[in-house]
């Protein structure tokens, strides 16, 4: 009987704990960004749903990757463009990357990307034109907004409905992250993301880093002009990028210092790099068969991401030629035209389980565009890389991994078949690359809390407390001259100059007095002698 009396309250306690968990449940509005950005954001949303929160996802009817089968409320709105329009504009942008890579905001502005960005930003106007949806959002009494800041619509929604926001991002162009969080970023050792410099810059690189920083301030307003015009129209007041980004409660940054260079951070910046890494699952039979057939040489995984569907024919043939000269089996995720010189060791697939393949012990190398998702999966699984960055932060990611000895970077526009062949043989045969990536993997995994759990905690924190004002620095309330202490410097300089002036005047007066008295004595002495 005593034993029964001891165990009987256990189910009741469990029920009470579960009840408490759901009593804490809140209401979250999610404004995601289309494309690969949604993949990892979705994992956070799904975990929040499992924890009992009421989640509402707002997305345009026209999208590539946005998932409508989530176990939550999904609200869609029509757009002024079709999926064909979106695909056409993106293909223009993607093809341009095979001709010239943007290494500054000005070059990005002058490229064909501006048309795609204008179309991309325009969907926010469509959201607010849907008065029924806006009224629903207004009456829903959300606790917070969970958003991707590259799509400024989430920031506009947060400001329009006066809701605390949790931002989910790898980084943002134009120093909007640093300015929005009021986080110092010394140009002497914090390189611009588009330049691909390390934190140990030469004098020439530091000069160029300053020039590009000034260029950002001059031209970023034009790159995001359409987005800011839409924001001003919706909010019915002139809006700057700082106005949108500066009200962020928590920044969930998909980075980690095994990839990022050490730099200043703010208390509302939470690092969740590697959130997309998962425990490897058993491979589909098709891929298991490829690996078994590869023998002792193993495999190489090749993917340039979900957004690159085709490569110019000449470049694709050069790549195929290089792949045919290594003994490994190459699994190439590619949906474009099959290169005519494709070797027997190279298998084209429309899709591959990238993380699961990278986690297989027979995987020898990873050919990647150095997107943050692929780079972190490579770090988590300890696979050295050959990196062929195309746009955005990819050049920066590649430089960081190369600096840490975890891979080789190739200029995809200039590389030859021989360059790719040599790079592959280097990362496969030189043990230092494997040792370096394994060291980074060990550092990355040595953490007290998993990135997904950390992200979920901070979203819930903002929901519970209606923001995180205690983490907001007073720098937001200062003018530019107060922030840089120019008024204090001016005051102290004025004091020093005043003291120096008074001291000089006193010395001059004393000197004149002494000299004048001495002169009168001499004159009196001369008159007596005469």
Curated annotation (Swiss-Prot):
The keyword Flavoprotein does not apply. It is found in: Endoplasmic reticulum membrane. The keyword Glycoprotein applies. Liver and colon. Isoform 1 and isoform 2 are expressed in colon, esophagus and small intestine; isoform 2 but not isoform 1 is expressed in liver or kidney. Its EC number is 2.4.1.17. It is an enzyme of class 2 (transferase). GO terms for molecular function: enzyme binding; enzyme inhibitor activity; glucuronosyltransferase activity; protein heterodimerization activity; protein homodimerization activity; protein kinase C binding. Glycans are attached at residues 71, 292, 344. Changing residue 93 to Y: Decreased estrone and 16alpha-hydroxyestrone glucuronosyltransferase activity. PANTHER family: EG:EG0003.4 PROTEIN-RELATED, UDP GLUCURONOSYLTRANSFERASE FAMILY 1 MEMBER A1. This is UDP-glucuronosyltransferase 1A10. It comes from Homo sapiens. The lineage of its organism: Eukaryota, Metazoa, Chordata, Craniata, Vertebrata.
């Amino acid at each position: 009987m005593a034993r029964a009396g001891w165990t009987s309250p256990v189910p009741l306690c469990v029920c009470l704990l579960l009840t408490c968990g759901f009593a804490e449940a809140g209401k979250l509005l999610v404004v995601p960004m289309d494309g690969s950005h949604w993949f990892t954001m979705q994992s956070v949303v799904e975990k929040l749903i499992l924890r009992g929160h009421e989640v509402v996802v707002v997305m345009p009817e026209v999208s590539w990757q946005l998932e409508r089968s989530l176990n939550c409320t999904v609200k869609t709105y029509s757009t002024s463009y079709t999926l064909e329009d979106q695909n056409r504009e993106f293909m223009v942008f993607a093809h341009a990357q095979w001709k010239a890579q943007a290494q500054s905001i000005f070059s990005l502005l002058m490229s064909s990307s501006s048309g795609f960005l204008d179309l991309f930003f325009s969907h926010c106007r469509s959201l607010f034109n849907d008065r029924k949806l806006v009224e629903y959002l207004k009456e829903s009494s959300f606790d917070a907004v969970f958003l991707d800041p590259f799509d400024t619509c989430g920031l506009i929604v947060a400001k329009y409905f006066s809701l605390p926001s949790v931002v989910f991002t790898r980084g943002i162009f134009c120093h909007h992250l640093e300015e929005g969080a009021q986080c110092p970023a010394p140009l002497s050792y914090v390189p611009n993301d588009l330049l691909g410099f390390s934190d140990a810059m030469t004098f020439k690189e530091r000069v160029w880093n300053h020039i590009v920083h000034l260029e950002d301030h001059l031209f970023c307003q034009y790159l995001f002009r359409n987005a800011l015009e839409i924001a001003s129209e919706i909010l019915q007041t002139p809006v700057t990028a700082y106005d949108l980004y500066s009200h962020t409660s928590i920044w969930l940054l998909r980075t980690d210092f095994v990839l990022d260079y050490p730099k200043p951070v703010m208390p509302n910046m939470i690092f969740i790099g590697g959130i997309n890494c998962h425990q490897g699952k058993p491979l589909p039979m098709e891929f298991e068969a490829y690996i078994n057939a590869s023998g002792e040489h193993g495999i190489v995984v090749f993917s340039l991401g979900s957004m690159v569907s085709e490569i110019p024919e000449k470049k694709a043939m050069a790549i195929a030629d290089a792949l045919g000269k290594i003994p490994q089996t190459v699994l190439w995720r590619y949906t474009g035209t099959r290169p005519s010189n494709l070797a027997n060791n190279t298998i084209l697939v429309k899709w591959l389980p990238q993380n699961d393949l990278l986690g297989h012990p027979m995987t020898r190398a990873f050919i990647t565009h150095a997107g943050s998702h692929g780079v972190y999966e490579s770090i988590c699984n300890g696979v050295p890389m050959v990196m062929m960055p195309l746009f955005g932060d990819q050049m920066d990611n590649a430089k960081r991994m190369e600096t840490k000895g975890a891979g080789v970077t190739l200029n995809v526009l200039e590389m030859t078949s021989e360059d790719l062949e040599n790079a592959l043989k280097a990362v496969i045969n030189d043990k230092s690359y494997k040792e370096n990536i394994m060291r980074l993997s060990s550092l990355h995994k040595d953490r007290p809390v998993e990135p997904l759990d950390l992200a979920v905690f901070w979203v819930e924190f903002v929901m519970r407390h209606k923001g995180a004002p205690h983490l907001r620095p007073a720098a937001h309330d200062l003018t530019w001259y107060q922030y840089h202490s120019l008024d204090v410097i001016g005051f102290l300089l004025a004091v020093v100059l005043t003291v120096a002036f008074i001291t000089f005047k006193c010395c001059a007066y004393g000197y004149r007095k002494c000299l004048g008295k001495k002169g009168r004595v001499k004159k009196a002495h001369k008159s007596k002698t005469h």
